[in-house]
Each structure stands twice: as C-alpha cells, then as structure tokens.
C-alpha cells in the first residue's frame, strides 16, 4: 500500500478491525518514511449475473426495494426489510463465490421473506417464479401449509 502523503510504497498496518456487517476490513496504517497515519477499507465485491448476460455488483438496496414492493400494504417495518436484505447478502456471501446469478438472489430472498410475511412471499414468488395462473398460486399456498 502506497502512502497517500509521500507515495512511499512501504507502509505498516498498526490495527485491523472487521466491520459490523462482517463484509469489510478497516486497517489503520502508518508510513515509516513520513510518520503519517491513514485508514484503508477493504471489501470483497459480490457480482450478480443477470438473465440478459450482464453483470453488476450485488446491491442490498436493490433486494430491499424489490421486497418492499411485495410488502406494500403489509405490516412490515423498514427494520425488517433491512434485516432481510442483510440475511440475503450473508447467505450469498457464505457460499464463497465471487459471482452469483440473479436466480440465486431470488431464491435467497424467498426463505426469509416467507418467514417475514406469507402474503408478501406469495406476491414476490408470483413475479419471481412467473406464475401463469391460479394453479401456480394454489400450489404455492399448499406449499406454505406443509
């Protein structure tokens, strides 16, 4: 790591801490040449491959936004949505992959959403799984009853 003050290529790490969400590392560094201290933050990037073939960074906010639409008019708090987004991201990152498909993201949303609100689950599943008719809804409802 180059010192941002004097561009010395050799710096020393004096403190390392993992962030609260566990997805980034904060390092406090010192430059032996100019003695200035600075902080770096290291994060790993999780990429999502879309059905169209495009690739974009994973966005917890995008997950929350999609689930929020399914929860519209339901007694679901914003804190619950944020927690669901965190659970989905943790699930995907725990797989140890640098890239996941949008289908895997959708599947990762279903379980925590089902636990949160079954009506919102049915709404989300109907779009995600492309329900064609009442039979698909009935099948999903039967699955919830099991």
Curated annotation (Swiss-Prot):
Binds 1 zinc ion. One of its GO terms (molecular function) is ATP binding. A zinc finger (unnamed) spans 3-34. It comes from the Bacteria. The keyword Methyltransferase does not apply. Keywords: ATP-binding, DNA-binding, Metal-binding, Nucleotide-binding, Repressor, Transcription, Transcription regulation, Zinc, Zinc-finger. One of its GO terms (biological process) is negative regulation of DNA-templated transcription. Residues 46-136 form the ATP-cone domain. Its cofactor is Zn(2+). InterPro entries: ATP-cone_dom (IPR005144), NrdR-like_N (IPR055173), RNR_NrdR-like (IPR003796). The keyword Ribonucleoprotein does not apply. Negatively regulates transcription of bacterial ribonucleotide reductase nrd genes and operons by binding to NrdR-boxes. HAMAP family: NrdR. Belongs to the NrdR family. NCBIfam families: transcriptional regulator NrdR. This is Transcriptional repressor NrdR. It comes from Bifidobacterium longum (strain NCC 2705).
